A protein has these predicted regions:
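A detector for small-residue-rich transmembrane helices and their helix-helix packing motifs
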Residues: 1-206, 224-228
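Extracytoplasmic/luminal low-complexity segments enriched in Pro/Gly and acidic/polar residues
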Residues: 206-212
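Soluble, non-transmembrane domains of integral membrane proteins
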Residues: 212-233
Length: 233
C-alpha cells in the first residue's frame, strides 16, 4: 500500500508537469465551499519536485511501519488522519490553498511514536525511537516558522495521530511478541533457599575391628548432630 500511494503521487505529478496543468486549486481552501474538495484531493497534490521528493520517503517508511506493525488499524489510521485533519485545516487554517501529503505523514509519525509510549513495551518503544531518529526534526513543522509551509496541516495531522494512538492502544500489534507473564502454580514447589547439604560418613564397625572396604554414605539432615568436615562436591 505505501508503495502504491507513493507511485500514485509521482504519476499525478508527472501528468501535471507533462501537460502543463496546475492542480493547486484542488487543495484545501479554508472556509470556502469550493475548498471542501481539497479535504479528499490535497494529499495527492505537490507544488514542485522537491516537495514531492521530501514526502515520498516518509510515506514509504512510515507507511510500511504502520502496515507491518499495526495492520488491523492501518487503514483506519490513514483515513482518519486524512479526513479529520483535513476538516480542521479547512476550519482553522489560513485562507490559502493547502496541498501535500505532509499532514498525513505527521499523523503517521505521531501515531507510531505515541503507540509505543502509551503501550510501554520496549519493542514498540524501539519503533518510537526509530521515528524520532529519522524524523525528529519534523517537530518544528507544527510551528508557524516558514510562511509557505502549511504548519496547520502538520499540527492537525500530529494531533489526530496522538488521539488515534490512544484510542487504539489496546489493539495488539502484529510481529511484536507479547510480554510473557509467568504465573505461579499451586502445586509447583518454591525454590529452596536452604544452603547445600553436606555429606557425612558413618562407619558401622568397632574401633578394634578391621575397617570395611567401602563405608556407607548417607545424606545428613539438619537435625543430625554430626557433619563431615568437607563439603561433597
Amino acid at each position: 500500500m505505501p508503495l502504491l500511494a507513493a507511485l500514485l503521487l509521482w504519476v499525478l505529478f508527472g501528468i501535471e508537469q507533462g501537460y502543463g496543468l496546475d492542480f493547486s486549486s484542488w487543495g484545501i481552501l479554508p472556509r470556502h465551499l469550493s475548498g471542501l474538495k481539497g479535504i479528499v484531493t490535497s494529499p495527492f497534490i505537490h507544488g514542485d519536485l522537491e516537495h514531492l521528493a521530501n514526502n515520498t520517503f516518509p510515506i514509504l517508511v512510515l507507511g510500511w511501519c504502520l502496515v507491518y506493525f499495526y495492520p488491523k488499524v492501518a487503514g483506519r489510521v490513514v483515513l482518519a488522519t486524512w479526513f479529520i485533519a483535513g476538516v480542521w485545516v479547512w476550519i482553522s487554517a489560513r485562507p490559502n490553498y493547502h496541498i501535500g501529503a505532509s499532514g498525513v505523514i505527521y499523523g503517521l509519525a505521531a501515531f507510531l511514536f505515541f503507540s509505543g509510549v502509551f503501550r510501554k513495551q520496549r519493542s514498540l518503544m524501539a519503533i518510537s525511537l526509530f521515528v524520532v531518529f529519522l524524523y525528529g526534526g519534523m517537530a518544528w513543522g507544527v510551528f508557524p516558522i516558514l510562511p509557505r509551509v502549511s504548519w496547520e496541516s502538520h499540527l492537525w495531522g500530529a494531533i489526530v495521530g496522538v488521539i488515534l494512538a490512544w484510542m487504539y492502544r489496546g489493539v495488539a500489534p502484529a510481529h511484536v511478541p507479547e510480554p510473557i507473564v509467568l504465573e505461579d502454580e499451586e502445586d509447583e514447589e518454591a525454590p529452596s533457599s536452604a544452603p547445600p547439604r553436606r555429606l557425612h560418613v558413618i562407619y558401622h564397625y568397632d574401633p578394634g575391628d578391621e575397617a570395611p572396604e567401602h563405608p556407607r554414605t548417607d545424606l545428613a539432615s539438619d537435625a543430625e548432630p554430626w557433619w563431615s568436615d568437607h563439603d561433597h562436591t
